[in-house]
């Protein structure tokens, strides 16, 4: 999941992280 990947995590707004969660990409997002 990109939210936990140092290459991507901080680039994405919370809305992107939430979209990933909705798609079932992964879990455990410290940014939420």
UniProtKB/Swiss-Prot annotation:
Its EC number is 3.4.21.-. The keyword Secreted applies. The keyword Protease applies. GO terms for cellular component: extracellular region. GO terms for molecular function: serine-type peptidase activity. It comes from the Archaea. Keywords: Hydrolase, Protease, Secreted, Serine protease. Residues 1-32 are annotated as: Disordered. It is found in: Secreted. One of its GO terms (biological process) is proteolysis. The active site is at 22 (charge relay system). Belongs to the peptidase S8 family. This is Secreted proteinase.
């Amino acid at each position: 999941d990109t939210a936990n990947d140092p290459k991507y995590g901080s680039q994405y707004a919370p809305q992107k992280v939430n979209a990933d969660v909705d798609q079932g990409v992964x879990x455990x997002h410290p940014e939420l």
